[in-house]
Structures are given as C-alpha cells and as structure tokens.
C-alpha cells in the first residue's frame, strides 16, 4: 500500500536524474519566458543553489508556494534527495514538503551500508517514525498528480538557504546532501527533532559526520576545505526534551585581502634575503624611479627580449626600497608582484573575476603604499572575455585598470617583450599611453661577467661547489658565441647553474664509487691501509713530542693526536674528501655548452687531436685523386676546432668545381662520416629542386597566407635544430638566381632570418657548394690550355686550370657571391690508375652487403681489370665504374644465389674465363663465420 512512497530502491536513479535535467532546461534563465520575467514554477520543482535561493512567495498554485530557481550547483545526490522528499510528502498526503520530509529524502538517498550518516537508520524505519510523529500511522494515501508538483514550505526554504550558506562558507562550489542535512539540523524543527529522538539518533553526531563527509569530498578533488575548521557543532535542548544540533560558523581570523591572496611582496622577500642580488642596471632603475614619481601616468613598462633581466629591475628596486636607498617619497613603499594566473583561477561565474579586480584596485588605493609589478602584462589584454558564453561576457581586465592607471591611483610596473608589446599594445592605444616605456637592452659581455660574479655565491651555496673566475668568463663567452637564440645574462646563468648541478652529481657518484671500493676490499688490504695510516701518525706524533719546548707542550701534543686519531681513519678521510666542494672550471662550462648546443667546444682530447691531425689521410681513403680539395676542407675544420676562425662567419664557405663523378659530393659525405660522426650529419639540398623563383620560400619558410606558413624552412629549421653540421648545396648552378641573394648574408654575416622572424645562426656550419661550371675546360685538359707545354709542372697546370674555371665562374655567378666564398676548389679529372683504387672501395661495399647474407666474396685482378676497362670514361668520372660493378658483379652474383648455387658459409670467387667474361666459383678452403645461419633472402 505504500508503493507511492519513495525509497532508495523503488525509483531508478536514471529517471530521477532525467527529472533534474529536465527541470534545469525548463527553468533556466535563458529559457524563461518574457526575457527574464519571473516564471511561476510548479511547487515541486528543484531549487536553485544560490544565496537568493527562495524569492518572495508568488501566487499559490495547487495550494503550494512557487519557487523560482534551478539546480545549478546541486549535485546529483542532492537532486535525488529533493525528489525523494517530494515523493515522500505526496505519499503521506501532505500539500507541502516540510523539514521532516526532507529528512526522509536524505535517508532514502543515503545508500551506504551503515545507513544515514553512519547512524544505521534506514528509510523504512524512518518513515514509520515520521508517520508516528505527525499522527498519520496507517496506510498511505493514493498519490494524486505528480510527486514533483509538491511545493516547499517556508521552513524547507530556510533549510535550503542554510545549506547554500554552509556551502559558501566551506569554500565549496557545489551543494551536496550533507549541506542540506546541516541546514536541516540547524533549523531546530520540532517534528524533525521528535523523529530523530524516536530513532535514537543524536543530531550533533549526525552533523559531525556530515562535516567529515564534506571534508572527504574536497580531499578527493585535491582541494583544501576553506574555513571548515571554523564550524562548531553544539547541542541544544528543546522544550520537549529533545536535542538539536546547532552548527555555528565562527570566522575569527580576518579573511585574507585580495593583495594577500593574489600578490607576492617583493620588498619583504628582499629584506629577508630571498631575492638574488641585482648587479648593474643603474640607469634603468633610475628611469623607473623617475616615472614612478610622476603625478599621473606614473606606470613604467619594461620592454626587452626574453632573458635580458626585466624582472630583475623590479627586484632591484625592491632591494633599494628595503635598504632605504631611494628618495624620501619612496620610503615605505611596497612592491607587490601580481600573479595573473592566480587572479583568474576559479573565476568561472559571471562577474566574479571583475569583482576580484575591482577589490584589488580598491585595496591598492586604500593602502596607498603599494606598487604593483605585473610580469608578462600582455596576458591581461583579453583576459576575462574568452570562454564566457558564445560571444563572451564580462569586462577585459586591462579595461578595468585603465581609469586607475590614468589618474595615478594605481601605480604599476609592467614588463613584456617587444614582440608582445607590438602585438597587443599597439592595438590598444588608450592602454599604451598609460604606460611609459623603458627599454631594457641585452648587457654587454663585461656587464654579464659582473652579474655572474654577483650571483656566484648564491649558486655556490645551492650546489655546494666553487666557481673559478675562468668558469665565469667561459660561461659568458661560450654562451654568447654558441647559443645564438638566447640572450645574456640568462643563458650564461643557465650554464653555470647546470654546470654546478653536473658537478654535484659527479661528486655524489665519486662518493658512491669510493664507498663501494672500500667495501669491496679484502680485510687484509683494509688493515694494511689502517696500519699505514697509524704508522704515519706515530711518526708525526714523535716529531711533535721531540721538538716541543717543554713537558707540558709534549702532553698537549699527545692529547691532540690521541683525540684526533679517529679523524684519520679511512672512513673519516673519505667523508672529508667527499665533503669538499667541487670545483667548476672552464672545462665543465664548455662540456655543458656542448651538451646544450651540440657543438664540440670543450678542450681537445687526445683522441680528437689525433683525429684532426690524421683527418687528411682519413679523407683520402674515400676520395681518390683530389688532394687539393681534401687539404682545403680539412684546414677549415682544424681552424674552426682550435678556435681561430672568425666567430661571426661560418666555419668555411667552399665551392667545389669539377666534372661529374670526380667525388665532390663524396668528399662532403666523407667529412661528415669521419669527423661529424655520421653521413646523416649533412644537411643536403639538391638545388635542382629550387629551379623556380617561388621555390626560394622553401629555404626560409612560406610567407603568411601561403600553405606551409608556420612550419619553417627546409634550410633554417635543419640548421636551427643542428647548428654544428655540414650544409651541402649540391649542383648550385641549377638553382634559380634569386637563391643566391638568400645566400649572401649567410656567407658574410653567418645568419638568416626565417619566415617566423627567428634568426638562425650559421656560424657553426661548414657550407659546401658543388658545381659543374668549368667542367668542360677541365675535361679537355691541355687542349683547352694552349699555352702549356710538356715541361710544365703539375702545380702550374693546376693553377692554369683553376684560373680558367674562375673565369667561367665569374661569367656565371655574380661578383658579390664569389667575393664571399672562402675558397674555390677545382677537382681533377680521374685517371685510369686512380680508377683501380676507387674500384677497390666499391668492391669493399659490395663485400659488406654480401657478407650480411653469410656469403664471402673475392674478386680476382683480371676481373678488376675487366671492370676498370668497362667503367672508365674520363668525361663521366667514377659513376660509369659503379654501373660496371653492378652489371659485372652484383647482377651475376644475385642470379647465382637465387638459382641455389651458393649458400650461407660459401665464399664466391669472381674471375674471368678464357673468353674474358665473368665467371663464379666456390672457394672450399675458405669459410665465413655466420652470426645468423638463416639467409635474409
């Protein structure tokens, strides 16, 4: 008979949530008819969780009170509890939802195993107690109409108002059933108290449990419950003998002001020594003080690139104020740094952010001694508009600050970069005129050294190390030369910081290794060290006793040695050696610079010095017959590695001229493999891909409005990511002439600006261009140079050939391009004797590929002569030789392997038969050791 009454299991949660969602849509402010007119909502509709929860009663409908609100902040559980209470009221035949109905709804919603708020009370038992309290024992009445049409009584309204107030004081952005329960217990309703008394439940214990649950919900979200400790629960005895819980909110501590919440006092931190000292910048700080002392528009804005020290100027002024080294009208001022992110965080309701800003302005005006420092001030422009509705709502923070800034009521020091200032402030002239610009330039290297010397003590204390003067100078010099995309002093400070961190890590590793070495020693070795140390100290003690002036001195010396004997044990010696601060020198700074930039700037090791000395011979192993080119490129690398090259230009700019197939590109690959570690270290651009005029944009990036804008250029992006590399511009004469205009500033100044406005440094690149200009003259040899005789030396012949090639280069390239090239290297045509050496290199590559299949390869001399005969062409260089190797060796071997003539472990002998054709045979006396006997075929 009580089917109409609600229980926790009788109503599906999905239908209840659908009811709540429908109520939200139906009675939201946007959907209210009449453009915001008060809408008469059915009495049983869910209510809005706000401070103005219940408005004045509207005309009655079905004998109830009309509620104008929606469930904007009610949780799903709170919606369920309200709907359950309405159905309980309908089941009991009541016309309104009274507080005891709310109690039944809360009990029905709480499905925990321990019952309602861990009291063990279930909904069936609570329903019986409630009927007995109101004198309606017996069968339930048949429901008439919808359960959600039941209105709320005035007492229930006060419960909801109290729940909203509890939620606000607790710092919650939601209203849960626990908040409703606290409001219910705080109401002191007689019927509710009688129900709880009959159930044998203490309301004060229930209130404490509700507070605990709220705290747990906030902890799950990682939030600190604001003001939760200010709630006190006490018991109050009712006239009928019952008890009710009174939950009081006592906020004795004064609420934090907006300045305390959103600002950081730089002056106080400077007084406590929590801010690094500011070295230099005297002129900039003086200019800032002059602007601050103006009557109106006394707001300086610091403009400069990232890392030049804009924030340090504000901190320097805070130091001066803390030390009293300012004019009399600035004494007692405070510089507060505004945290814009903290100011905006959590302001999701309309008007909340504006209220914070106006409160901040009001407190600054009231204090009278506050100077706000807003770092990255461009973030204020547009803040507060984005993300608020379809078209945005609320005022811009910058617009809120304009009146106070113009009248001088709000003093502000702002900072931003030049690019951000141009992007944001140039569009808002009204805001820009309220700030007076102070340009902060990058300090010179001398000033940067002074700054680092002033900061050295701070970093030495933190990293437990010592910085030498050479390390400070090296940090400034190396960062200025090899880290081009950052600015001083920021990049130099980062170098010493990371070098100190590295030194501390190395010290820890050494300590662990020494400890492990002591533990790994045998007992005999350990005691031998102890006896050796004891013998040394006995000798020292004997000498002190022997040369003491009197007996008392002897006794003192003995006592001193005996007391200090424990300090000479191996363990104490280990701790003493490891506690000694590490020394950071220029080599450590150079090593960090190399790790950072990818450029080897540390001192030459023995292996690297040996590699550089033998670089010529290493390159000649791969490039045959081009000694002049090998010498030119190796000299450039050696000059750069020692540090004698011009720091404002690339390592070298070379152009290789010669006929096709003589090794121009191969020499560049050989250099990358020998010194740079891999052939992939080469940035190769085939200039035949840049034959059109519009293809110039491929190098530096597409301009705005074109596809690919923002992706960067092929050349600039490759060098920006890998500054220490070889740039190969292959077949340069095939590119469009406009390409040469791009290359001019690279060759001369060592930098190039891409489409994004970023300057890319080419100062650590080796630029090589290959060209076939003059190849015809080189191939013709003496026939082209008619004045030569048989008695001419090789040097004269090469010089004459080079001069002839230069004439053709001057006819093809512009003078301003040729004038920026360091050296023009002319490659010799390959002779037949040189072809045999090149053939051996090619056959070694073929052997390596066949060996991967588990098969060896040998080639006879007669076969080599046959390949050289077929592959030699003076006009085409070594490329015909490669084709001959493919046709006479690789094709024949591949056919034999596929036909099953050879298997893994065999060695193939390639020879010529009686007719002079290639033939294959198996060498049985030679085997190949296989790592994997399964062939890859």
Swiss-Prot record:
Gene Ontology molecular function: ATP binding; ATP hydrolysis activity
Origin: domain of life: Eukaryota
I as annotated region, ranges: 259-513
Record key words, sorted: ATP-binding, Chaperone, Chloroplast, Nucleotide-binding, Plastid, Repeat, Transit peptide
Record: transit peptide: 1-80
Entry comment describing in which tissues the protein is expressed: Highly expressed in stems, culms and leaves.
Residues given in the record as ATP binding sites: 304-311, 658-665
Domain called Clp R: residue spans: 81-217
Biological role stated in the UniProt entry: Molecular chaperone that may interact with a ClpP-like protease involved in degradation of denatured proteins in the chloroplast.
Name this polypeptide is given: Chaperone protein ClpD2, chloroplastic
Organism annotation: Oryza sativa subsp. japonica
Source lineage: Eukaryota, Viridiplantae, Streptophyta, Embryophyta, Tracheophyta
């Amino acid at each position: 008979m009580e089917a109409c009454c609600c229980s926790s299991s009788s109503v599906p949660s999905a239908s209840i949530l659908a009811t709540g969602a429908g109520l939200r849509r139906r009675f939201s402010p946007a959907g209210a008819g009449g453009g915001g007119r008060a809408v008469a909502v059915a009495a049983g509709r869910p209510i809005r969780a706000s401070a103005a929860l219940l408005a004045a009663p509207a005309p009655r409908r079905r004998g109830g009170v009309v509620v104008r609100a929606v469930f904007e902040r009610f949780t799903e559980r709170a919606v369920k509890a309200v709907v359950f209470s309405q159905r309980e009221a309908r089941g009991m035949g009541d016309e309104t939802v009274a507080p005891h109905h709310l109690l039944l709804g809360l009990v029905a919603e709480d499905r925990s195993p321990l019952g309602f708020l861990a009291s063990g009370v279930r909904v069936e038992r609570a329903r019986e107690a409630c009927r007995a309290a109101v004198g309606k024992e017996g069968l339930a009445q048949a429901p008439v109409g919808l359960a959600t049409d039941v209105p709320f009584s005035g007492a229930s309204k006060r419960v909801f108002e109290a729940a909203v107030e509890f939620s606000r004081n607790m710092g919650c952005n939601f209203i849960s059933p626990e908040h409703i329960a606290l409001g219910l217990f705080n109401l002191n309703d007689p019927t509710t108290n009688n129900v709880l008394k009959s159930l044998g439940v203490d309301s004060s214990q229930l209130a404490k449990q509700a507070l605990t649950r709220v705290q747990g919900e906030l902890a799950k979200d990682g939030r600190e419950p604001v003001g939760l400790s200010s709630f006190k629960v006490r018991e109050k005895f009712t006239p009928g003998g019952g008890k009710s819980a009174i939950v009081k909110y006592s906020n004795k501590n004064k609420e934090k002001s907006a300045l305390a919440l959103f600002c950081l006092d730089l002056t106080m931190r400077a007084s406590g020594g929590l801010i690094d000292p500011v070295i230099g910048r005297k002129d900039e700080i003086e200019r800032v003080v002059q602007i601050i002392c103006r009557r109106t528009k006394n707001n300086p804005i610091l403009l400069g690139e990232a890392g030049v020290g804009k924030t340090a100027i504000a901190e320097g002024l805070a130091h001066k104020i803390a030390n009293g080294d300012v004019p009399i009208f600035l004494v007692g001022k405070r510089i507060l740094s505004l945290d814009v992110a903290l100011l905006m965080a959590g302001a999701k309701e309309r008007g909340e952010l504006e209220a914070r800003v106006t409160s901040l302005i009001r407190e600054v005006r009231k204090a009278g001694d506050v100077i706000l420092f807003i770092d990255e001030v461009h973030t204020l422009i547009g803040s507060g508009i984005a993300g608020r509705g379809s078209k945005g709502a609320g005022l811009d923070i910058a617009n809120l600050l304009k009146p106070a800034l113009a009248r001088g009521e709000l003093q502000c020091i702002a900072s931003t970069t030049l690019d951000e200032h141009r992007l944001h402030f140039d569009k808002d002239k009204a805001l820009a005129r309220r700030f007076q610009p102070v340009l902060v330039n990058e300090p010179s290297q001398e000033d940067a050294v002074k700054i680092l010397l002033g900061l050295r003590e701070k970093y030495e204390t933190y990293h437990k190390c010592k910085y030498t003067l050479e390390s400070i100078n090296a940090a400034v010099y190396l960062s200025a030369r090899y880290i081009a995309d950052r600015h001083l002093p920021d990049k130099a400070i980062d170098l010493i910081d990371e070098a100190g961190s590295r030194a501390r890590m190395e010290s820890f590793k050494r300590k662990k290794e020494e400890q492990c070495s002591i533990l790994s020693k045998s007992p005999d070795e350990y005691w031998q060290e102890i006896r050796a140390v004891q013998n040394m100290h006995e000798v020292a003690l004997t000498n002190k006793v022997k040369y003491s002036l009197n007996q008392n001195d002897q006794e003192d010396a003995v006592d001193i040695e005996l007391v200090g004997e424990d300090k000479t044990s191996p363990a104490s010696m280990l701790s003493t050696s490891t506690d000694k601060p590490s020394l950071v020198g220029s080599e450590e700074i150079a090593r960090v610079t190399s790790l950072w930039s990818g450029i080897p700037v540390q001192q030459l090791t023995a292996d690297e010095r040996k590699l550089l000395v033998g670089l010529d011979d290493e390159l000649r192993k791969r490039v045959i017959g081009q000694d002049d080119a090998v010498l030119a490129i190796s000299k450039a690398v050696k000059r750069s590695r020692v540090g004698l090259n011009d720091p404002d230009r690339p390592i070298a700019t070379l152009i290789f001229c010669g006929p096709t197939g003589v090794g121009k590109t191969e020499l560049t690959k050989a250099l990358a493999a020998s010194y740079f570690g891999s052939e992939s270290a080469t940035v190769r651009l085939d200039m035949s891909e840049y034959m059109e005029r519009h293809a110039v944009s491929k190098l530096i990036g597409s301009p705005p409005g074109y596809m690919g804008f923002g992706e960067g250029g092929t050349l600039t992006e490759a060098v920006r990511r890998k500054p220490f590399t070889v740039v190969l511009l292959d077949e340069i004469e095939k590119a469009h002439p406009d390409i040469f205009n791009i290359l001019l500033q690279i060759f001369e100044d060592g930098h190039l600006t891409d489409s994004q406005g970023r300057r890319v440094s080419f100062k650590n690149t080796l630029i090589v261009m290959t060209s076939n200009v003059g190849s015809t003259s080189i191939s013709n040899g003496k026939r082209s140079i008619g004045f030569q005789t048989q008695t001419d030396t090789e040097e004269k012949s090469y010089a004459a050939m080079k001069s002839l090639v230069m004439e053709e280069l001057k006819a093809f390239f512009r003078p301003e391009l040729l004038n920026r090239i360091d050296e023009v290297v002319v490659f010799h045509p390959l002779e037949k004797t040189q072809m045999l050496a090149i053939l051996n290199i090619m056959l070694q590559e073929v052997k390596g590929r066949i060996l991967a299949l588990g098969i060896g390869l040998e080639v006879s001399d007669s076969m080599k002569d046959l390949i050289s005969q077929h592959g030699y062409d003076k006009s085409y260089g070594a490329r015909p030789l490669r084709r001959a190797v493919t046709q006479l060796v690789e094709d024949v071997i591949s056919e034999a392997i596929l036909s099953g003539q050879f298997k893994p472990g065999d060695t193939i002998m390639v020879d010529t038969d009686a007719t002079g054709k290639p033939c294959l045979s198996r060498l049985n006396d030679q085997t190949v050791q296989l790592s994997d006997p399964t062939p890859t075929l």
